[in-house]
């Protein structure tokens, strides 16, 4: 009996410990784990499970990402020490302790179940997103809140933080609150910088070529982490070429602070220094005062990224084509070919890229997006998984994986991948917009609107969150708000010129206008809706949504009890064109459905149904039903209609 009783008493403690598991999603550089009760640090491994009491530390040029059991994501910066602590209120409350370093916290599920500690303060998380920094007991603890609410407590009191606020806890435990800087600036250390150096441009001495051989070989192969690990320790006698290579590897691995320190030691007017400054400016969307024509392959590749940040896609593609034959250069060409929707050229370029640099993660990610465009979901998922195996912090690969899983109907997995994408690169407005779409589709408008707001705050010129939020409002019959957001999306359309060529921008505007036409019609502005749909067709005649809108509009103008059915031929023509242009399974085959151009966040269902019935006091009945869907790329629709008219029927005057 005593054994049984002691066993029952232990169960809550065991359940609490097991409830707070986490796994290492990805890491780069030297990252080590210390198990609870052990004194021996061991190297980290991807997907390694950590338990309460375990510790994780990152080296000088290292990062790691943990996903907790409640789907919280911790993005841990270099030189950090983190411990997962036993719950303070088993089994609900979970805790982690940041002894030193910096982390980014993101949770969109149940953030109220987590607490954190630093040497100076504790925090109760009632928010979902913040940046936390600690410097032991001798330095300050700093917290900047992007979204939600956090209660920060010390022996001197408690401070409640709202979104956009930050707090500093000094060694004497006093708390000072202030307004935070812009959200995008708070997460600058999470930015991803492209690799641009062509090692053939380096003027290395023979002895330097030998000492850097392993690192250079890994870099040419596209393996930035291996190149970082193979770098010899810096010495005072390092030549400018050695410093340039070290700078390139550090920047591509994400350690921009160390890279900028090295950049300051290079000659300001050197070709390499200009190239690296252009890359940093491109990622931060900053302007560069002077742009002399590059004289190296590295310079042209850096110029390509900078010109894209200035919305000069043609110039960017021309610069990439002058950047040589490296895997990095061919990957860049493939990315820009995709921006012009030139899929054949993109396929040739990405094949060359992978042949030249088989371990370069962005190359596999680009090929994944190509396969996704071709609806080869198995191949796309394999490419994205390969990219993530090489670099688990690549946000584009997580996004591609999410979109692919969504197309396969694996909605929950897709949303988890989107959360990881947002955690890897929290400054990317596009990732937040996609995550908000997922919440909207799953019927969670509060979380959706929260991420839409954050996406707008990260990039006020991005039309994507306005478009998606407008469609979200339309799904919940909030059409006035939908009109407002869709109008703003149309107004901001050309701000996407950083990523889209002119032809694709026109297609984007057509999509926005077609959806805006539906919203106008829903609020009773029929004539405005017609004109907006006409503009959509003028921008892009291949926009199936605009043709579908025209078909529905003509159908409403028909009079089934009159002799004049002149709209029927035009309606059938528009419906035929819409179905020829539309992707399969969008429900457009049916003549009974209302306008079906709402974005389907994660793909159409295999089977869906719609129906209505109408009865009039004169004895007339009108009913219709439709079954439609998509199975393995095949779209279908089955319509039925039954009508009885008590003495009235079409063309009854003959």
Place the predicted regions along the sequence by residue:
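Register position in tetratricopeptide repeats
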Residues: 220, 252, 309, 339, ...
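Flexible, surface-exposed loop/linker segments and immediately adjacent secondary-structure boundaries
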Residues: 17-207, 213-214
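Helix-start (N-cap) detector for alpha-helical repeat units in TPR-like alpha-solenoids
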Residues: 208, 240-241, 271, 297, ...
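Outer-membrane beta-barrel translocator/receptor signature
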Residues: 573-654
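Structural marker of alpha-solenoid helical repeat scaffolds
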Residues: 237, 269, 322-326, 356, ...
